Amino acid sequence: MTELFYSREISPWLGFVICACLGSFLNVVAHRVPRELSVISPGSSCPNCSASIPWMLNIPVLGWLVLKGRAHCCDSRISPRYFIIELLVALVFSGIFFSFTNHQDWCMLLASSAFAWLLIGVVVIDFETMLIPDRFSIGGACAGFVLSLYFPSIHGVHFHPYGLESLQSGYSSLLGILIGSGCLYWIGALAGRAFGREALGEGDVKLLGCIGAFCGCKGAIFSIFGGALTGCLFLIPVYLWQKLRPSASEDNNALAFGQEIPFGPYLALAALGYFFFLKDLINPWFKWMNELVP
């Protein structure tokens, strides 16, 4: 059975099927957690008329396509968000499964999957509600710290001369939580003092603690600046496009100076970029921290 997971031909498809289900569950979590509803019961129901959804129409990805984006019970429109999230999570996790079939490090596979699932959830919820639930930020930080103790390879610790791999990895995780959230707290406090209004929400500060738990303090610090850059790369073209099209500027959702914009999604995207692609490229820039963090 384990050969299925190690196969580069089968593993991504297996990951797609399994993680499409995780994407479906993420949709449930993203809808219910901000509203303080149970994610267990009741079962899935139509968002318009609350009719129960049969299991055969609730199959991830396929269900939305079969129904052509319309509810079977009342023919109301189903947001494409459900389909997009299920497909996105399935594709992302297929890539994770594929990348780990080479070295078969299932500790990193578990940690990477948990981290990606958490941050995709943050992106969805923060964009929709301007809030980051503590279950994702504080809960994610606790999960990252515990996983670091059990699976030291999360922080690149594979051997310690005195057999203290777990302690060294846990130290890196704890330092990431404290330095990451501490840096963003003071950036927000100073910016709030300078502009006379709240510049960063507490949710962003706690989210960076979660990022630090998985990425260490180097990844957390990178995520602050990487998140700001990612936000600028996305928001500046949108702002300019609205200025060039007067009809877009009249929209109630149009960007304007002084408008509150969620920072959490951009922190999350920068953290995912660091964790999966940029770690080896970015870490050499933090050589000055090597005395503090191996």
Give the location of each predicted region.
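Transmembrane helix-loop junctions in multipass membrane proteins, especially transporters and channels
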Residues: 32-40, 98-102, 153-156, 192-197, ...
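Multi-pass membrane catalytic core of lipid/isoprenoid biosynthesis enzymes
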Residues: 52-108, 112, 204, 225-226
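Membrane-interfacial, low-structure loops and terminal tails that flank and connect transmembrane helices
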Residues: 45, 158-165, 246-255
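Functional transmembrane core segments of multi-pass inner-membrane proteins
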Residues: 15, 108, 114-232, 239, ...
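Membrane-proximal soluble regions of multi-pass membrane proteins
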Residues: 26-81, 254-257, 263
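Alpha-helical transmembrane segments of multipass membrane proteins
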Residues: 22-27, 89, 93, 147, ...
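Interfacial loop-to-transmembrane junctions
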Residues: 202-203, 240-273
